A protein has these predicted regions:
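Terminal transmembrane helical anchor/hairpin motif
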Residues: 5-46, 169-241
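Long, hydrophobic alpha-helical segments
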Residues: 50-75, 171
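Short alpha-helical transmembrane interface motifs in multi-pass membrane proteins
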Residues: 64-67, 103, 107, 133-138, ...
Length: 241
C-alpha cells in the first residue's frame, strides 16, 4: 500500500509524455526484452504500471510467496521427520496436502488483492483515471500465474521431500518462462515458443488496458489442476519412512 501511494503520488506530479519520449528513443528490442512483447508505454498510468509494477515487481511477490509456500507444503514436515506423526492423527494424506495447497492459494490471493485494492484506491485518491476492470484483470492473471508456479512447487516437493529443491526448481521454471516470453518475440524462429510460457498468457493482450482475455486464463487453470491431481497421486503413494 505504501509503495502504491508513493508511485501514484509521483505519477500524479509529473508529465508522463516526457518519459515516453525518452523510451521511444530506445531500440524496440530492448523495450520488448524489458517489458515483454507489448514494449514499454509510459504515456499513460496503465502503461507505467504495466512496465514498472506488473512486469517484474508484482510477479516476483506473487510467485515467491506461492512457490515458497507450495514447496514447503509437505516437504518441510517430511524433512523434519514429523510428517508421519502428523498423518497418524485422524487426517488423510489427501486432506493434509489439500489444506496446505489452500493455504498457498490464500496467500497468493492476498498478494493479488492488495495490489488491486492499493492501486485502485490510490489512483482514485490522486484523481488518476485507471480502468477498474483492467486492474482486476491483471491482478487476476497475477493470482492465477502465482498459483500455477506454486502447484509446480507442491508437486516437486512430493517427489523428493526437499523444500529447497522444490522452491529452486519451480523458481527456475518461472525465470525461464519470463525469459522465453520476452526473448522469443525478438527471434522469428523462436517466436512460437512464447506460447509455452505462462508469462505470455499473463500479459499478452494487455489486460491492464483491455480487461480479462477470453481464454488466456485457461492455461493457468489447466496447469494448476494437472499439478494438483498428480501431486495428490504422488503424495498418496509416497513412502514417508
Amino acid at each position: 500500500s505504501l509503495l502504491a501511494l508513493y508511485i501514484i503520488f509521483v505519477l500524479s506530479s509529473i508529465e508522463l509524455n516526457a518519459f515516453q519520449t525518452i523510451i521511444d528513443s530506445f531500440p524496440k528490442a530492448l523495450t520488448q526484452f524489458i517489458a515483454g512483447e507489448s514494449g514499454i508505454d509510459f504515456g499513460s498510468i496503465e502503461g507505467f504500471l504495466n512496465a514498472q509494477i506488473f512486469t517484474i515487481m508484482a510477479p516476483i511477490f506473487a510467485i515467491s510467496v506461492a512457490v515458497n509456500s507450495g514447496g514447503k507444503s509437505t516437504a518441510n514436515e517430511e524433512s523434519a521427520k514429523s510428517l508421519d506423526i502428523i498423518l497418524s492423527a485422524p487426517i488423510t494424506r489427501e486432506s493434509f496436502i489439500t489444506q496446505k495447497i489452500l493455504s498457498m492459494i490464500s496467500k497468493t490471493f492476498f498478494i493479488a488483492t492488495v495490489h488491486w485494492i492499493s492501486y485502485f484506491l490510490m489512483c482514485k485518491f490522486f484523481s488518476e483515471n485507471i480502468s477498474a476492470e483492467g486492474l482486476f484483470a491483471i491482478c487476476l492473471n497475477l493470482f492465477l500465474m502465482g498459483i500455477s508456479f506454486g502447484m509446480i512447487s507442491v508437486y516437486i516437493g512430493t517427489l523428493n521431500g526437499n523444500s529447497t529443491n522444490a522452491i529452486a526448481v519451480a523458481g527456475g521454471f518461472a525465470l525461464i518462462s519470463y525469459l522465453i516470453a520476452n526473448i522469443a518475440p525478438l527471434v522469428d524462429s523462436l517466436d512460437f515458443t512464447k506460447y509455452f510460457s505462462l508469462f505470455y498468457y499473463y500479459k499478452s493482450g494487455d489486460p491492464l488496458k483491455f480487461g480479462v482475455h477470453n481464454w488466456h486464463w485457461l492455461p493457468f487453470v489447466g496447469i494448476s489442476l494437472i499439478f494438483f491431481t498428480i501431486s495428490l497421486i504422488q503424495f498418496r503413494k509416497r513412502n514417508l519412512l
